[in-house]
Amino acid sequence: MKEQKKVFIKTLGCQMNEYDSARMHEVLNEHFDTVKTDDYKDADIILINTCSIREKAQEKVFHELGRWKGLKKTNEDLIIGVGGCVASQEGENIIKRAPFVDLVFGPQTIHRLPEMIKQKQKSQQSQVDISFPEVEKFDYLPEPKAEGAKAYVSIMEGCDKYCSYCVVPYTRGPEVNRPFEDVLAECAILAEQGVKEITLLGQNVNHYLGPMENGQTADLALLIHFIAEIDGIERIRFTTSHPVEFSQNLIDAYATVPELANHLHLPVQHGSDRILINMKRNHTILEFKQKIRKLRAIRPDITISSDFIVGFPGETEEDFQKLLDLVKEINFDQSFSFIYSKRPGTPAADLPDDTPMEVKKDRLKRLQDLLNSNAQIISRQMVGTNQRILVDGTSKKDDNILSGRTENNRVVNFKGDKSLIGQFAMVKITESLPNSLRGELI
């Protein structure tokens, strides 16, 4: 009989981490009969899945660990583990700073968690494994367990871009693609469990080049075509993309695959070619615009979101104005925007940066004001339209109100029977609010 363990997992960062955290629980459950808990004080295993994109990420992790340290006094068998990108960066240093930590594991070694726990219990020594064993983890992970009608599926790991500001190639390793048939099998398993929307994940997901059993290679467009043929899958998304690999094949898929959501997240990071060169993004603004123009020729009403960095070393007011001009021209929807965060070990960390923080904060506010204005206009334009909603559950504020998302990722709240949860429903949008929409079931 398997030993029962209560597991608490705190997830920081991107959708890839959310996917990894779900798989952590599944692999632990195979060995220990685990039960999820939302209270870390009640847990037998506490894991934090970390993100290192932003500045001071390490300190946030050690602050969280400090909250858990005292639990060892009342539960000497408690296992505390640190995973994710901070674990990859810091490795043994985590144990040196926090000797009470039992496990340190990278994104590519989550499948080894049960064995690491057993080794810790046997030797009473902290276990560290931050290696990059390519896609080995997918060979050893159990079948995925769906939670609701939406699911993430990781199709590749790592990144080869080495943008000058980014730590991902150092923490996630080089690009490694999951075999084509393996991805299809995982999607089919999820569809059998009632999943209707799949989000394909990768640090540079549109550079997917998956090996096929026939010896050929499948790109993302071909993968999407095959996933769309799986019975039950009715909506497909993918993230995160790079403009360089946003290929004509992928653009054409928007014409031939109706299951592809009418929304694209395509990080451009800046609107100035000079800044893009210093970021080592390997494309120009003109090339980005040309790809968007081709996409909108196929899907005129598609909404496009992005990621933006302001205050990159050497950014002038002229550079920043070019960013604002791009946001206006493309009409970017809900997007992520940040002040540049220096990451140790990256080339950009050595660039001279003499822009005052007050100026950077002002630029960020101006950018976010423009992005929010764009998003509100798009939301108001949806009032009176009929939208196909995938019903996620009930509203956070009212258990008698259903809540779901449109193709362009808007939250819609409306009255309806709870039997609709996990299903698609047609809803007429009646009101636009700052962070959501209201509607009526048709």
From Swiss-Prot:
Its cofactor is [4Fe-4S] cluster. [4Fe-4S] cluster 1 binds at residues 14, 51, 85. The keyword Iron-sulfur applies. Its EC number is 2.8.4.3. Keywords: 4Fe-4S, Cytoplasm, Iron, Iron-sulfur, Metal-binding, S-adenosyl-L-methionine, Transferase, tRNA processing. It catalyses: N(6)-dimethylallyladenosine(37) in tRNA + (sulfur carrier)-SH + AH2 + 2 S-adenosyl-L-methionine = 2-methylsulfanyl-N(6)-dimethylallyladenosine(37) in tRNA + (sulfur carrier)-H + 5'-deoxyadenosine + L-methionine + A + S-adenosyl-L-homocysteine + 2 H(+). It is found in: Cytoplasm. Residues 145-378 form the Radical SAM core domain. It comes from the Bacteria. Catalyzes the methylthiolation of N6-(dimethylallyl)adenosine (i(6)A), leading to the formation of 2-methylthio-N6-(dimethylallyl)adenosine (ms(2)i(6)A) at position 37 in tRNAs that read codons beginning with uridine. Monomer. Belongs to the methylthiotransferase family. MiaB subfamily. This is tRNA-2-methylthio-N(6)-dimethylallyladenosine synthase. The lineage of its organism: Bacteria, Pseudomonadati, Pseudomonadota, Gammaproteobacteria, Thiotrichales. The gene is miaB.
